[in-house]
Amino acid sequence: MRRKVLRDFVIGVLLLFVLPLAELSVAIAQESVFTVQQPDFQKSPYTGMTRQHWIQAGEYLLKGAFGYIHTLDDQMYFPKQLDKTYPNNDGQVPVAKLEGLARTLFIAAPLLKDNPELVMNGIRVADYYRHQLVGISNPKSPSFIPHRKGGPSQTLLELGSLAISMKAAQAVLWDPLTKAQKDSLAATMLSYGEGPTIGSNWMFFNVFILSFLKDQGYAVNESYLESNLKKLLARYRGEGWYNDAPAYDYYSAWAYQTYGPIWAEMFGKKQFPQLAQQFLANQHDMVANYPYMFSRDGKMNMWGRSICYRFAATAPLSLWEYDKSSDVNYGWIRRIASSTLLQFLENPKFLEEGVPTMGFYGPFAPAVQIYSCRG
């Protein structure tokens, strides 16, 4: 069980895209650089990082975001950094707030699974996220998201991300909601999950919404779910690499080779076992080459789109456990994951006012896209 919680936490931290930053009237003190307290070089000869240090790293990151949260109604919405990023108008603000909620929950969910009583900045973290989830479908809430109107949008991605976290910490985030609250939230999610998408990694977010709600007993468009899964698998090009319409970069890792195996483990083995097995087989193809994308000391290159996602590039490594293969050097991949995490957390430019910057180390416009948001 402890190993599973560690794996789930590793997934949560590695799936972190980039935390948002909020403008407050009261300035927040600059966070100190993360340090590994009492490293254990017997268990981890190179980094000293153990399970407990990974938990501390997650709390360190989440603490910065919660420095801006003082009530359950406060939203994870922060001023943009760099002109090219979004939001660029008032119409984009609601989804920017939703992105802040969804992306920070990628860290909070595994922490809550390990410690449901977690408190940050005087706020019970579980209460905060449940309150925000309920607010998504409440027209009177500042967190309200209306049902879909029109084509695919960023809202689809964030609701799909929430579905992952709600499954990962279901006993804390989803189960305590009333039936009416669940039904209302499900209706909002379905309006996007069953709606149009883009033929890239975006299809995963339709998949997670539909699979999660199917798992909870809701009627979903199963043919659309299966169709998106098959289209995602069709983008596989061999040796562990997917083509993301049309790019080859770390998206193959932090999207296809992360979301695919997570879907297989969370839902696929029960819902579509043959498709789940194919995702896991494709995952294993990475073992022979992907670790060599990192340096001898376990650090990553600045390569590809959305590089401000940073250590999300190591996300597939912790998921190789799903395959139960004997040819995986788990010590090596743990060393890579820990070294890449520390590559950023130990860099003094990584944080500004407690949260990550929009860049690789510090703010750096060439490392972000127009769809990048401090969320």
Predicted features by range, described:
Residues 2-13:
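Bacterial N-terminal signal peptides that target proteins for export
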Residues 30-100, 124-132:
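Low-complexity, Ser/Thr/Pro/Gly-enriched N-terminal "stalk/linker" regions
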Residues 97-98, 106-111, 122-321:
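Aromatic-lined, polymer-binding surfaces characteristic
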Residues 66, 70, 105-113:
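Short amphipathic alpha-helical segments enriched in leucine
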Residues 25-28:
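Sec/Tat signal peptide C-region and signal peptidase I cleavage site
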Residues 11-23:
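Bacterial N-terminal signal peptides
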Residues 319-375:
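Extended polysaccharide-engagement surfaces of secreted carbohydrate-active enzymes
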